[in-house]
Amino acid sequence: MFEARFQSFDDPEPAQTGPRVEALRAELARRGLTGLILPRADRHQNEYVPRCEERLAWLTGFTGSAGTTVVLEDRAALFVDGRYTLQAATQVDSSVFAIVNVGETPPDKWLGQNLKPEAKLGYDPWLHTVDGAEKLARACADAGATLVPAEPNPVDAIWTDRPAPPIGAVTLHDFRYAGEYASSKLNRIRTEVANLRADALVISDPHAVAWAFNIRGSDVAHTPLPIAFAIVPPEGKPALYIDSAKLSNAVRHNLEEIANIRESADFIRELTAFGLTGKTVRLDQATAADALARIVTTSGGKVTRGADPIALMKAVKNPVEIEGAHEAHLRDGVAMTRFLAWLDREAPNGALTEIAAVEALESFRRDTGLLKDVSFPSISGAGPDGAIVHYRVTRATDRPIKPGELFLIDSGGQYEDGTTDITRTVAVGEPTAEMRERFTLVLKGHIAIARAVFPDGTTGAQLDPFARQHLWAAGLDFDHGTGHGVGSYLSVHEGPARISKLGNTPLKRGMILSNEPGYYKTGEYGIRIENLVLVVEGPKVEGGEKPLNAFETLTLVPIDRRLIEMSMLSYDEISWIEIYHARVAAALMPQSDDQTRDWLAAATLPLGQG
């Protein structure tokens, strides 16, 4: 009945872990190296990478979006964060790799405990940031060992059937969606470069390239990125380094008006030539590959470090992008609510599966006529699978959604006017008292973020406890951030702002972030409630001395009333739910079909009714 066109459920190819690790050790020995540290990354430090950059998955079998392995002569470890500990345990051969929670033991600490004096640890300078490489070098030095560049990457030497780099077509991102011409953006960037007293800014982040030049690509699944570099001087045209096979004549003609187009293969040579002149290049040490700094400095140039100015420009949406976000979330809300109504009809018989749910939801989004892609592979977790934070269902793991279980669905869409990301946890049948209690604790944290009022300069780290306070009081917590930034028809995970213990960037008006506290009971169920929120001007307070900010909730989808324990909520919390549901109903009713309208009317009734 339904099908998924933008995501597959194929099982990951079983990694021949033992033979591959032994082949890697042989290659390292041939190069005189004791070991190798390998993160899941590419030259651009992307979170989502092309298939040809999936070295970590090829070597270890782990397919999560974040992780690092260290392979030494006699041992190996895979480092993952709390989102992926359960997934890694099912995908990785524990007889070869020790699975380590990076929050408890980061790689540098592990290296200090396991490297032998005089050891030579290889690293690919393209896959580590400047900061990251320096941290590793210190850890090696403390252990009496040495960090050694390993180029070309040793894994590439043994990965004989490695896929070719992608050649995805580049499209122009129209002004009616971008809200600012590329020429204007580049002028702003040039001004920043001049203010920084640099001779050039190297743009290595494809998100920044896409934003600055008003282009989108198809080199990375679910994120419309063109893999490219750029160099922007304080005056004159920037240079855009991109494979010309990705550019149609029309796109190339448009770009040539604002940039000098170069082949990707020219980038290293021209960056080296730039360094030979002794000029100063600006790099973001937290996001730029260590290889870039090495190229500039070894050729005689200078590197100044600091935050990429484009990251903040991109994160603060302009009025056109904000209006696009409203339109995208309304459209997405219609599709998501249609799905939830359908789910309530189909799930109680116990025959509906996790894959069938994903296929239906994607189909409903495609029915809008404007879906370009999903924004990430949908997380469709029934019962115990919901406790795997970034669970990805495959044909081997697919299971029915059974009565008496919780079903967690985390998904999103890519539209030219905006990117969406939403999680709902749904009761199938009658939930237990514990499920209702835990869900309500999560909901209280979600509401606390949604209702937050905060002064200019407030960071995500300062807001993060709002989402956890009620869970903490019950001796509970969740092992992931509360929120991440979201792009405008770009990545569903966008920096620099986030709501987490590590979120040190002040939140600014125009930023879009997620609000997604959760709770996960291993082997039983998972709970997460996620809406996207927009930072807006806060209320005017009589006698107040500081400008205030607040959040506007963008997502328009009901929250499952069956899981809410009303007695645990304050008057203000109940009021927030009622106002939110009234807003959802008013927005979605006119655009919903008859069956969905009936369901929506019941789903948005005041608490205690129905």
Regions found by a protein language model. Give the residues of each.
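Active-site neighborhoods and metal-handling regions in enzymes and metal-associated proteins
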Residues: M1-G610
